[in-house]
């Protein structure tokens, strides 16, 4: 496909984006808004953002959800801006500095919350800064400006949603159904690999792919939930399927690890059974029916606990899968599965990374303020706004440097494109609303195609071009003002990029160590006799941390294996019949406190000391378990956990 070619699958969204822009433009001028540009810009960003992230037309519900987040972020930012102005209107410099800190604070929060919701906080940060900068000449008009900005943004969002509904957005339901079938086959094939006990790298690749696919399925569930309320039952089932899929991965990998020391546990009966290849979900269904008969014949005692647990989870997966595909009423058996255990939320391991993002945003905004005050440039305020926008949006993504480069390319492309519209097209079409709408529709159509290709600079070019062309009411054509705005955007992006390069993010290793220690803490916390604590479902949170570890350290197999081993230890100890008595309960509470100290330790010396204390306590715990005559289901996992922690002691404690 050529660089300027147009694929058929890209046309519908390009028309949708053009329609959203035209609707916002028409409504803005029809209701005599002072700056219809904000409505048009909002419609373009809300519609194009999900398409750029997806690399194609977004699924149904994505644009609505992004619009909802934008409304929330705008209102939070407007309220914060009003509070800052009311409190500090007599000290303008201090007011701007507080706004810079507010933008940094919002970036800090957006780095810690779910990536889907971080957009609202990033927006809240720079909205307050936009309000404070814009009202500098006339502070008394602050409430009016805040109300107008909110109104224009809501109009833009409504127009984007109307355009999305008008062109029948894609439903993700069929993709979910296909992935459920395919994922079950992949789970069975992973178990086959683990029972064969072949090449470790092949097994590592297989379970790593399954972790990614399960995480992707969870993202599809979020999309389906946004799409329509009629998928509420399917959403409940998919949430339980996420845990079941992770359970299947855990049991398969434990089957592989058990054979490293005790290969005789997997009998020839099961080895021969899992030799039969499967290609479809129907093949897996037949094999599971046969496998349940084999287990009924051999008995639960003669069946390895990992295979028994795997079959139980796969059977539940199958039952819920049928319910998701048909979206029928939830029956009593499904309801029993769905009641399940409450999921546990873990503390973010990226606090240091979030603090780096705070300083990047705050320092870049302060640098923009100093540049504005030092030069006295009329468009210094525009540069400041772009600095806040770039840093607020870039920091929450995995590669902020590339986001900043995208904005630089976009603002550079917007200069000639905006010049064409400012000097030629808009002056010749402003007398006709139809011609004006057609001219902007053409811009939206072609940039909409490039956005779907994820072309570098396409998203920045769309937003920057709309921002600098004259879409005010009434239209005024001052070339110096246009040039200032265009250059202000470029300078702001370059300054933001400079700060991102200078304030380096060296938090990766620290985040990795915190994640690994959180796995250790989870394994230790499973040693409890508290019934409520044992019913807590840690699995989704643990695999979410594992997925983050895989993204932070791609290809680092030793780290992945260590994390997976800790997850397996957690699951095994959680189900182990630990003797119930006050002595063990008190000692396990002490061990959990020590594990928490390992995570929270700020220096290597403290971390080593607490980790050494944890190892000593694990040795004492093994002795106590022998005294209290704990069964092998308890002593063996504790012994394996202690051995793993001794082996990887330096990796878990040293910076």
UniProtKB/Swiss-Prot annotation:
Residues 1-12, 59-68, 114-120, 173-369, 428-430, 480-481 are periplasmic. Residues 34-37, 90-92, 142-151, 391-406, 452-458, 503-655 are cytoplasmic. InterPro entries: PHBA_efflux_AaeB/fusaric-R (IPR006726), PHBA_efflux_pump_AaeB (IPR023706). The chain crosses the membrane at residues 13-33, 38-58, 69-89, 93-113, 121-141, 152-172, 370-390, 407-427, 431-451, 459-479, 482-502. One of its GO terms (molecular function) is transmembrane transporter activity. Keywords: Cell inner membrane, Cell membrane, Membrane, Transmembrane, Transmembrane helix, Transport. It is a multi-pass membrane protein. The keyword Cell inner membrane applies. GO terms for cellular component: plasma membrane. GO terms for biological process: carboxylic acid transport. It is found in: Cell inner membrane. Induction: Positively coregulated with aaeA and aaeX by AaeR. It holds the Pfam family FUSC. Forms an efflux pump with AaeA. Could function as a metabolic relief valve, allowing to eliminate certain compounds when they accumulate to high levels in the cell. Belongs to the aromatic acid exporter ArAE (TC 2.A.85) family. PANTHER family: MULTIDRUG RESISTANCE PROTEIN MDTO, P-HYDROXYBENZOIC ACID EFFLUX PUMP SUBUNIT-RELATED. This is p-hydroxybenzoic acid efflux pump subunit AaeB. The gene is aaeB.
């Amino acid at each position: 496909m050529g660089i300027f070619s147009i694929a058929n699958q890209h046309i519908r969204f390009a028309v949708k984006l053009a329609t959203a822009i035209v609707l916002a433009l028409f409504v803005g001028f029809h209701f005599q808004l002072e700056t219809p540009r904000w409505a048009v810009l909002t419609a373009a960003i809300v519609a194009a953002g999900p398409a750029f992230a997806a690399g194609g037309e977004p699924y149904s519900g994505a644009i609505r959800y992004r619009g909802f987040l934008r409304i929330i972020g705008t209102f939070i930012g407007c309220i914060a801006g009003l509070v800052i102005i009311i409190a500090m209107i007599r000290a303008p410099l201090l007011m701007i500095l507080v706004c810079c800190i507010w933008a940094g604070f919002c970036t800090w929060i957006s780095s810690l919350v779910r990536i889907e919701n971080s957009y609202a906080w990033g927006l809240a940060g720079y909205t307050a800064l936009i309000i404070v900068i814009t009202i500098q000449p006339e502070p008394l008009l602050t409430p009016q400006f805040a109300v107008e900005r909110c109104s224009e943004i809501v109009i833009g969002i409504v127009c984007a949603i109307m355009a999305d509904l008008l062109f029948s957005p894609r439903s993700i339901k069929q993709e979910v159904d296909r992935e459920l079938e395919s994922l079950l086959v992949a789970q069975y094939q992973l178990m086959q690999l683990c029972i064969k006990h072949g090449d470790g790298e092949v097994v590592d690749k297989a379970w790593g792919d399954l972790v990614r696919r399960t995480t992707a399925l969870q993202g599809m569930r979020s999309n389906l939930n946004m799409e329509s309320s009629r998928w509420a039952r399917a959403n409940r089932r998919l949430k339980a399927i996420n845990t079941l899929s992770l359970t299947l991965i855990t049991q398969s990998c434990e089957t592989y690890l058990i054979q490293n020391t005790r290969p005789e546990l997997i009998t020839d009966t099961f080895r021969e059974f899992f030799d039969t290849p499967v290609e479809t979900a129907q093949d897996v269904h037949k094999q599971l029916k046969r496998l349940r008969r084999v287990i009924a014949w051999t008995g639960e005692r003669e069946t390895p606990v990992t295979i028994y647990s795997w079959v139980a989870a796969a059977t539940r997966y199958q039952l819920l899968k049928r319910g998701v595909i048909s979206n029928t009423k939830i029956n009593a058996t499904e309801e029993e599965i769905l009641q399940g255990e409450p999921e546990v939320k873990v503390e973010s391991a990226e606090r240091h990374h979030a603090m780096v993002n705070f300083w990047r945003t705050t320092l870049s905004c302060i640098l923009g303020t100093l540049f504005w005050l030092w030069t006295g440039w009329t468009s210094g305020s525009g540069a400041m706004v772009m600095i806040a926008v770039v840093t607020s949006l870039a920091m929450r993504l995995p590669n902020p440097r590339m986001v900043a480069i995208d904005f630089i390319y976009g603002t550079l492309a917007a200069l000639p494109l905006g010049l064409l519209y400012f000097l030629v097209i808009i002056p010749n079409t402003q007398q006709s609303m139809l011609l004006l709408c057609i001219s902007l529709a053409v811009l939206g159509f072609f940039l909409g195609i490039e956005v779907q290709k994820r072309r570098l600079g396409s998203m920045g070019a769309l937003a920057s071009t709309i921002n600098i062309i004259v879409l005010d009411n009434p239209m005024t054509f001052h070339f110096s003002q246009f040039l200032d705005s265009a250059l202000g955007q470029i300078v702001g992006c370059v300054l933001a990029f400079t700060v991102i390069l200078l304030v380096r993010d060296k938090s990766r290793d620290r985040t990795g160590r915190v994640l690994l220690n959180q796995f250790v803490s989870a394994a230790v916390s499973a040693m409890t006799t508290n019934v409520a604590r044992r019913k807590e479902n840690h699995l989704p949170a643990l695999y979410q941390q594992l997925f983050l570890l895989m993204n932070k350290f791609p290809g680092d197999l030793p780290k992945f294996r260590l994390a997976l081993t800790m997850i397996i230890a957690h699951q095994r100890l959680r189900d182990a019949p630990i003797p119930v008595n006050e002595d063990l309960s008190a000692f396990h509470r002490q061990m959990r406190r020590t594990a928490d100290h390992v995570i929270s330790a700020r220096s290597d010396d403290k971390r080593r000391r607490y980790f050494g204390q944890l190892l000593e306590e694990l040795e004492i715990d093994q002795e106590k378990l022998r005294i209290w005559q704990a069964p092998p289901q308890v002593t063996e996992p504790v012994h394996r956990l202690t051995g793993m922690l001794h082996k990887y002691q330096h990796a878990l404690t040293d910076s």
